[in-house]
């Protein structure tokens, strides 16, 4: 389980294959944790005695002391969970793995080897939510996802093409020169939301390129809730074109940390 403002729970068979995944949101970490566990057991007609062990990760894991309902409970540090989960879902041997959650963390991960924290940033989903409420009055993630789809970036961002008739060095006309520097008077809430999403995703993209240069790789695995934003693929594709970095958003990327915690605990447990 990955416990933050919501709990993501993943059940695995002994061979590491996934049984199911679900997400439960509640007012506090313990309520979401026990709600997620109860929901999962009921959905799959399982008993507590059917569980070999429970692996916890995420900041909310600190609220749990001892075993849960008498089931052996293991706490796994979040960074190894992110690294193992990102590699498992992407089927890569090594990569920079990015966790795009409330904030952003960038890790270097090697399968069966080193997993280390490269750097982190306070820019992430929390930034998007806070600025979104300030600027548009919307902070719910589902509404942010919906609203940004209809936005027009040309109403918000200044591009190379706005300032030059051609390329500037290797930068094409559509590349962003300055976020929010072209804010139009008639910009809609959707336009502003699209600009906010672009600001956050581009900041993460820039950090990931620098992390790749540091680690000597060109492979980035993206995980976390922000991977579900509709413009994510388009934004990171531009980074691929500009810097030759391969961005992978694997299936079930939002559950990467929970999956990684389960796999890591099974590996450490022998």
Give short role names for the model-derived ranges.
Residues 133-211:
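Active-site rim beta-loop-alpha module in soluble metabolic enzymes
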Residues 72-79, 237-259:
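Conserved phosphate-binding/catalytic loops in two-lobed NTP-binding clefts
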Residues 22-26, 42-78, 115-117:
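Short beta-strand-loop/turn "lid" adjacent to the catalytic site in phosphate-handling enzymes
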């Amino acid at each position: 389980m990955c416990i933050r403002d919501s709990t993501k729970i993943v059940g695995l068979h002994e061979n590491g294959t996934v049984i199911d995944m679900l997400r439960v949101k509640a007012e506090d970490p313990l309520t979401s944790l026990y709600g997620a566990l109860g929901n999962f057991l009921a959905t799959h007609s399982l008993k507590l005695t059917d569980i070999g062990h429970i692996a916890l990760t995420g900041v909310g894991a600190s609220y749990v002391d001892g075993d849960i309902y008498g089931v052996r409970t293991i706490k796994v540090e979040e960074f190894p969970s992110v690294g193992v989960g990102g590699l498992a879902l992407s089927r890569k041997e090594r990569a920079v793995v990015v966790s795009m959650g409330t904030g952003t963390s960038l890790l270097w991960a090697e399968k069966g080897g080193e997993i280390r924290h490269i750097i982190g940033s306070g820019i992430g989903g929390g930034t998007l939510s806070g600025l979104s409420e300030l600027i548009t009055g919307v902070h719910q993630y589902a509404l942010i996802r919906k609203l940004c789809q209809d936005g027009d970036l040309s109403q918000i961002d200044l591009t190379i093409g706005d300032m030059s008739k051609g390329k500037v060095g290797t930068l094409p006309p559509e590349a962003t020169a300055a976020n929010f520097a072209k804010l139009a008077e008639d910009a809609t809430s959707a336009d502003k939301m699209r600009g906010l999403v672009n600001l956050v995703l581009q900041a993460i993209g820039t950090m990931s390129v620098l992390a790749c240069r540091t680690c000597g790789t060109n492979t980035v695995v993206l995980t976390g809730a922000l991977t579900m934003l509709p413009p994510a693929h388009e934004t990171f594709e531009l980074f691929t074109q500009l810097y030759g970095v391969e961005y992978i958003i694997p299936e079930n990327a939002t559950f990467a940390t929970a999956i990684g915690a389960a796999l890591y605990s099974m590996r450490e447990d022998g």
